[in-house]
Amino acid sequence: MTPTPIPIPAAATAPLPTAATAPPPPPAARATDWTAWHLHLGTTARSAHDRVVTDVIGPTIRELAPGTPWFFIRYWQSGPHLRLRVGDLDTAARARVEAALTERLAAAGAPAPGEEPLDPAAYRSGAERLAAAGETGENTSVKALLPPGVHPAAYEPEFDRYGGRALMPAAESLFTLSSDLVLAALPRVGSERQRAVLALRGTVAVAAALGDPADRAYYYAHGLGAWRAWAAEAGHPAELLDTITRVEGAVTLDPGSHGPFAGWHARIAAHADEIREQSPTHPGMVLFSHAHMLHNRLGLSLLEELRTYAVLAHAFPVPEGTPVPASAPVPASTPAPRNV
């Protein structure tokens, strides 16, 4: 199920699609009453999943009141699908959203020419690989395929992953911002190179919230090691991983220039301060998951995310003689979303 990675050019300076400017965070984050749907497709084709984001989820969200919280992710369990969460809907609004999703998915979700229909055997093989690569709980086993369509679901926040219950509303506001950015960017992504560069620049914007250059360098180095380990657990051969992580020549990146991710960086940096004040968790542990979910929303694979960290670890190596941080800046277990 994991596509071949797209190499990121050394000079990662291609123009980025314009994305939404981040609004200021709410004065006080509060708990949201979430309604969830899983939008299942009969193909793993990235183009089909992009189409569901732009032609199904996007128009449905735009019909809601301005400022309605929402977010989406892409996932594999029970078959390829997008998980949509919308906040604070009353009963009538829930019914309208579900009806709109159902109507639009019926039109946009069918595989287009060149989008291969899902092979159940291939799903099981790929899902078994993903389940074995560091998953926990119910996702260590492969669930039966669900048919294409809109399936009501439950949202279970991952409190531990995002720094604790008190920090979850702030994390969810970042889910909304990340989803808004990707929804704005996808129609303007004309190549896989642009998609990869978006993920690269978004990750730089995240790392810049961690502090000095040494902190960022350790974040990239640990991220590279973690993703390589998870890729190996998923069954990818060492020779392939060597190829993906090989970066030659100079990489031109300005770590302080965030372009369309300027608002994203500002909100991430503010959240890093919240984590330092309210949680014993290293901010990098939480921000690593936010960077991963940006990759996920952009539709990038495990191997493509590994490539992101290979490029950044090459561009910003750990300075010689730098003390090892007291706590790891990235998690030791898989960052893949589970219940979100």
Each language-model region and where it sits:
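An acidic, charge-biased composition feature
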Residues: 1-340
